[in-house]
A protein has these predicted regions:
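Active-site-proximal catalytic alpha-helix in oxidoreductases
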Residues: 173-212, 237-241, 245
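Anion (oxyanion) recognition and catalysis
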Residues: 16, 105, 160, 214, ...
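Rossmann-like NAD(P)(H) cofactor-binding subdomain of soluble oxidoreductases
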Residues: 46-128
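Rossmann-fold dinucleotide-binding core
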Residues: 96-178, 185
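NAD(P)+-binding Rossmann beta1-loop-alpha1 motif at the extreme N-terminus of oxidoreductases
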Residues: 1-47
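NAD(P)-dependent Rossmann-like dehydrogenase/reductase catalytic/cofactor-binding core
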Residues: 203-316
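Short phosphate-binding/catalytic loops that engage adenosine nucleotides
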Residues: 20, 39, 89, 109, ...
Length: 316
């Protein structure tokens, strides 16, 4: 598991508890905390501590035939991560956005995209939180660019054994584009406090994106189909002392990481807009403001929606 934060750490703990042999690759204070005390997973049912092998880099791992690497870092870190892996290893992209798979396929033959519906958080070294119960999430998988060949079924079976809903899908990228639409609000939801006006901005971001995807001929699920897909599996519940925080972008600001995923979420829409000649000023504005906040290490909710909108017309 390359990246042991909210998603990677939670999945690694659940896979380990289900009997899979798991190793985590992490860094910084989180790495040191896990080396000292293991990984603490908090869920609505209670908490559990997991003694999992943890490493600071792929070169420290004793790679063996049959190993699979699961990428669980933010997309801005993917290229460096891929270059550090041994040749020929199957790569599972447990990540938001739709850019990671193309990056991975340039270097690796077997690439397995996962559409991640897994509400988690990670704000404290050595601790990850999974908020949905009894099913922790949905992790459908496929083979990139399409199909379910290779190890997709075996990986889905491992996810199911760990409690997830997971099935191989030949159209997995259709679902990853659907998830991309959901994630377009991450930036403004991280930057601005909750309000009706904030939700109106999210609607604009998604409307703009749907127009671009339609022009590009890229398929995605409609809102009703997407709601039905998630409804019977994702059930976020309270955890004592651990209120549900925000998205992965919100958590990046809260931890002061200095980076954020907006270039590969809102920026994906901007890229397609430029390729197909469609203006995307709402998503470009979200991308710029998110990067500015991350670089300045601004706190979540530090921008009002009035400030967000007042600078929108400055986007060329």
């Amino acid at each position: 598991m390359y990246g042991a934060g909210a998603i990677g750490g939670s999945l690694g703990a659940l896979l380990s508890a289900a009997g899979e042999q798991v190793a985590l690759i992490a860094r910084g204070a989180h790495l040191e905390a896990m080396r000292a005390n293991g990984l603490l997973l908090q869920r609505p049912e209670g908490e559990s501590r997991h003694a999992i092998d943890v490493f600071g880099a792929p070169r420290e791992v004793d790679w063996r035939d049959g190993d699979v690497v699961v990428l669980a870092m933010k997309t801005q870190d993917t290229v460096d991560a891929l270059r550090s892996l041994p040749p020929g290893v199957p790569v599972v992209t447990l990540q938001n956005g739709v850019a990671n798979e193309r990056m991975a396929l340039r270097l690796f033959d077997e690439v397995y995209p996962v559409c991640v519906m897994f509400p988690t958080s990670h704000l404290e070294p050595g601790v990850v939180v999974a908020h949905s119960s009894p099913t922790p999430g949905i992790l459908d998988i496929g083979r990139y660019p399409s199909g379910v060949e290779g190890q997709a079924e075996a990986i889905a079976a491992a996810f199911r054994a760990a409690g997830f809903r997971s099935e191989p899908r030949a159209d997995i990228m259709r679902w990853k584009y659907t998830k991309l639409l959901m994630n377009l609000g991450n930036a403004v939801e991280a930057l601005c406090p909750p309000s009706e006006q904030r939700q109106e901005i999210v609607v604009k971001l998604r409307e703009e994106a749907r127009a671009v995807l339609d022009r590009a001929g890229i398929e995605f699920a409609g809102e009703e189909e997407n709601r039905a897909y998630r409804a019977d599996a994702i059930s976020v519940k309270e955890i004592a002392g651990q209120p549900r925080t925000g998205s992965s972008s919100w958590q990046s600001l809260a931890r002061g990481t200095g980076t954020i995923e907006a270039d590969y979420l809102n920026g994906e829409v901007v890229l397609l807009g430029r390729l197909y000649g469609i203006p995307t000023k709402w998503n470009e504005h979200a991308r710029r403001l998110a990067n500015k906040a991350a670089h300045q290490k601004a706190a979540p909710g530090s921008l009002t929606t009035e400030e967000w909108l007042s600078s929108l017309d400055l986007v060329g």
